[in-house]
Amino acid sequence: GDQDDTYARYIRPLWPELRQMEMGGMTVGLAYNAQLRASKENQVFYSPEWMQENIRSKGPFGEMYRVWGDGKQMVKGDKFDFFGLSGYTVDELKKQGYVVWTGIQPKGSYLAEGDTYCFLNLIGNGLRGHEDPTYGGWCGGRTVLPDSVKNLPRMEQMKYRAEHYPLPDFTAPVMNGLAARFKWSVTPNYADANHEPVIKGALAMSAKPGEKLKLKYTVTDPDKDALTIKWWQYVSAGTYRGKVTVDDPASANTAFTVPADANPGDTIHLILEATDNGTPQMNRYHRLIITVAE
């Protein structure tokens, strides 16, 4: 929202009542050349084969989706947009007048998303990232650095964030969610498409240090798919920085003991994640916020 001073020079002067939230960190690779930084497991989502099967072949919306070597150019004569061309070397593109500012990828492979990051936390996936910028979600979250770190060089700040505020990798669920929505756009019958699991249960609890809480949740799938359950801690969202686990991370009905060294007022964010075995796989989350009582 702040690219090219859009917020400072346009949005804020005209709509001063709008709330701005700045997110930090990368939880999913959507930028140019994201495939170069992706893990081995996530490489598939950027390949020409995956893009064709899951995006480009899905009706008129899929046909409009930009990929490398698609023969398109957003604005005719744009010397920075050489993405639609294929079969040329960097030197050959430069001779044609293009400014080759990023590496060339195979024809049909993933190109890039734009302002999608700004939208991801608005998707109702159960992470509730839109409720509070510190919660975090598919597009990351806001963290408040200690004063001793704020004045350090940027690289030192990034190192500190990585060590003390680890972020989840949401690449697979985001890309699968994108693929599912493209399929929805060409699937008239609800039963012929895959959908997210449904999770019901408490959103908040409170307990004293050392106290055990019973966690009971209902997890179902509208398509009757088999589900995989996983509990995990969203470390950067809570004020308690220690690592915690539930008794049975693979069960929707389990228990959790508040750490003995937790202080009154500390918060612990636990995420219950359900993943189905449909095609494409879809995820649903449920954020439980535990506040340590006196």
For every predicted segment, state its role.
Residues 280-293:
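C-terminal edge beta-strand
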Residues 1-214, 226, 230-240:
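N-terminal acidic, glycine/proline-rich low-complexity segments
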Residues 219-223, 235, 274-276:
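Extracellular acidic, Ser/Thr/Pro-rich low-complexity tracts
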Residues 200, 233-263:
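Low-complexity "stalk/linker" and mucin-like segments enriched in Ser/Thr/Pro/Ala/Gly
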Residues 266-270:
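Exposed beta-strand face motif in extracellular beta-rich ectodomains
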Residues 218, 232, 255-257, 271-273, ...:
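Residue-level recognition of well-ordered beta-strand positions that form the cores
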Residues 229, 252, 286-288:
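Extracytoplasmic/periplasmic beta-strand context in beta-sandwich domains
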Residues 209-211, 248, 260, 264-265, ...:
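Surface-exposed loops/turns
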